[in-house]
């Protein structure tokens, strides 16, 4: 076997030991292999993906190789749903939560990285254990990234996690109480609706698009149940289309005390938008 072949063989063995979290064989071989930064990054990236906790701790404690940045490891351990990057959950010891516990023992500071992303991704996965662990370790900021409320429904609809964060003083930047209420209504999350009402949400603060989507998702009864004031729609009455509906709408009006034209506005919006 040539020298290069031997080096490549040993590198393959090291990768195998990292995947298996075989610390004994890893330590026996690592000193025999010249690890440049690129290969060190590769090994510790694999270790992060595989939740090879023994290997990672050894590398941190010895600085034997240049490792994948710690804050990037934590991103993998928390999970990146938008990119499909996750640490594997193999058993009670080799899993993403245990890896997070290990990583958070070390300095995770990186001035160029928004730490709010950790909490955002944990909440998006509805992973209460990860959310609690991050908050307990001082990560108490979450930024709701998108201005489109339908993209944040996974956060708003997790009202129990939202409650935990609020109760524990997390700074939730970009949080919109009306969008949170809307998300729970269209998801038929009655407990979430009740919670958001309790902390100040108002059904009549919903914007028109939210009202339309609630009707689109067959939740119009919820608007009646929560006493939405349909007559707020007066400002949209100057629309000739609203005069083209039959007498069936009058029956609806008689049963609900809603102005006919306001119902027409909603129906025309639904047809034009969806």
UniProtKB/Swiss-Prot annotation:
InterPro entries: Ankyrin_rpt-contain_sf
Repeat (ANK) residue spans along the chain: 78-112, 114-144, 146-174, 176-205
Keywords: ANK repeat, Repeat
Gene3D superfamilies, alphabetized: Ankyrin repeat-containing domain (1.25.40.20)
Domain of life: Viruses
Protein name: Putative ankyrin repeat protein R597
Higher taxonomy: Viruses, Varidnaviria, Bamfordvirae, Nucleocytoviricota, Megaviricetes
């Amino acid at each position: 076997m040539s020298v290069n072949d031997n080096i490549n063989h040993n590198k393959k063995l090291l990768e195998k030991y990292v995947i298996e979290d075989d610390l004994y064989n890893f330590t026996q071989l690592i000193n025999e292999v010249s690890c440049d930064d690129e290969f060190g990054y590769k090994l510790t990236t694999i270790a992060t993906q595989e939740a090879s906790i023994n290997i990672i701790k050894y590398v941190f404690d010895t600085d034997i190789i240049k490792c994948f940045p710690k804050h990037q490891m934590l991103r993998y351990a928390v999970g990146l749903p938008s990119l499909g990057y996750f640490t594997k959950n193999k058993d009670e010891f080799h899993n993403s939560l245990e890896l997070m516990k290990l990583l958070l023992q070390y300095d995770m500071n990186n001035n160029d990285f928004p730490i709010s992303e950790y909490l955002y991704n944990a909440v998006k996965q509805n992973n209460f254990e990860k959310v609690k662990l991050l908050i307990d370790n001082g990560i108490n900021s979450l930024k709701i990234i998108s201005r489109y409320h339908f993209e944040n429904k996974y956060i708003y609809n997790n009202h129990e996690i939202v409650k935990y964060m609020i109760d524990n003083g997390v700074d939730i930047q970009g949080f919109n109480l009306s969008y949170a209420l809307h998300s729970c209504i269209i998801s038929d999350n009655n407990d979430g609706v009740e919670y958001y009402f309790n902390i100040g949400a108002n059904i009549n603060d919903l914007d028109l698009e939210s009202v339309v989507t609630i009707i689109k998702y067959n939740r119009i009864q919820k608007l009646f149940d929560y006493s939405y004031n349909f007559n707020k729609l007066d400002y949209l009455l100057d629309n000739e289309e609203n005069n083209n509906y039959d007498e069936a709408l009058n029956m609806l009006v008689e049963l609900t005390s809603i102005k006919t034209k306001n119902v027409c506005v909603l129906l025309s919006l639904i047809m034009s938008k969806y």
